[in-house]
């Protein structure tokens, strides 16, 4: 079983929905350790992504993901725009001309996208950033691919891993970004970027079941 282009479009549509619904929650998280604008930025960015989907829904997956990345780069403020934009642009390079993705191809897409984020943000696991979710998600997909699991099962597992990983940032001290200025006071708060990655994985798991 593979993930279809239509399911990718549904995923991005669901991301638009979740970032609208959870905008205030994400901004609340960011208020504790950041600029108090993460939820607003993600909502604005994915609203723009969803607006553009009808005109490109018949294109290949790589085209759709690149368009998503460029839209996020141009419409999301702060550090999140470049990081999430980079993820989708790098993911697009791994999915050029594809109408569907096997689990192995999905793993490669996430691996390349996450590598782009890590390279651009210069963060490592344990820094209390979205990389604390991307890294275990990629590893989960790699293991699922090796075990020849179905795409829906693999993405459900990755979604569960993402939730646990996002929650794990609560006990971390931030070493990157504005949150790092707080030192030990950053401990006890969940990272908003990591939480956004969690929401994205939850939405992909749902889209894969459709």
From Swiss-Prot:
Q: Which organism is it from?
A: Escherichia coli (strain K12)
Q: Which gene encodes it?
A: dhaL
Q: How does it assemble?
A: Homodimer. The dihydroxyacetone kinase complex is composed of a homodimer of DhaM, a homodimer of DhaK and the subunit DhaL. DhaL also forms a complex with DhaR.
Q: What is the lineage of its organism?
A: Bacteria, Pseudomonadati, Pseudomonadota, Gammaproteobacteria, Enterobacterales
Pathways per UniProt: Polyol metabolism; glycerol degradation
Q: What is this protein called?
A: PEP-dependent dihydroxyacetone kinase, ADP-binding subunit DhaL
User: What's its job?
Assistant: ADP-binding subunit of the dihydroxyacetone kinase, which is responsible for the phosphoenolpyruvate (PEP)-dependent phosphorylation of dihydroxyacetone. DhaL-ADP is converted to DhaL-ATP via a phosphoryl group transfer from DhaM and transmits it to dihydroxyacetone bound to DhaK. DhaL also acts as coactivator of the transcription activator DhaR by binding to the sensor domain of DhaR. In the presence of dihydroxyacetone, DhaL-ADP displaces DhaK and stimulates DhaR activity. In the absence of dihydroxyacetone, DhaL-ADP is converted by the PTS to DhaL-ATP, which does not bind to DhaR.
What turns on this gene?
Activated by DhaR.
Q: Which UniProt keywords apply?
A: ATP-binding, Cytoplasm, Glycerol metabolism, Kinase, Magnesium, Metal-binding, Nucleotide-binding, Transferase
Subcellular localization(s) per the UniProt record: Cytoplasm
Residues at which ADP binds = 38-41, 79-80, 121, 130, 178, 191-193
């Amino acid at each position: 079983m593979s993930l279809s282009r239509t399911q990718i479009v549904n995923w991005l549509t669901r991301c638009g929905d979740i970032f609208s619904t959870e905008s205030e929650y994400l901004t609340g998280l960011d208020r504790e350790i950041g600029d108090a604008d993460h939820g607003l930025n993600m909502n604005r960015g994915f609203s723009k992504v969803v607006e553009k989907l009808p005109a490109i829904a018949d294109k290949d997956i790589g085209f759709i993901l690149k368009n998503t990345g460029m839209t996020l780069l141009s419409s999301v403020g702060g550090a999140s725009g470049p990081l999430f934009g980079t993820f989708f642009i790098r993911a697009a390079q791994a999915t050029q001309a594809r109408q569907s993705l096997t689990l192995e191809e999905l793993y490669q897409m996430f691996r390349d996208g996450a590598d782009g984020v890590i390279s651009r943000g210069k963060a490592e696991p344990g820094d209390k950033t979205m990389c604390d979710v991307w890294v275990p998600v990629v590893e989960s997909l790699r293991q699922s691919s090796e075990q020849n699991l179905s795409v829906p099962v693999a993405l459900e597992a990755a979604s569960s891993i993402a939730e646990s990983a996002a929650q794990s940032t609560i006990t971390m001290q931030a070493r990157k970004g504005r949150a790092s200025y707080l030192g030990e006071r950053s401990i006890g708060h969940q990272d908003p970027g990591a939480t956004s990655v969690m929401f994205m994985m939850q939405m992909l798991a749902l889209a894969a079941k459709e």
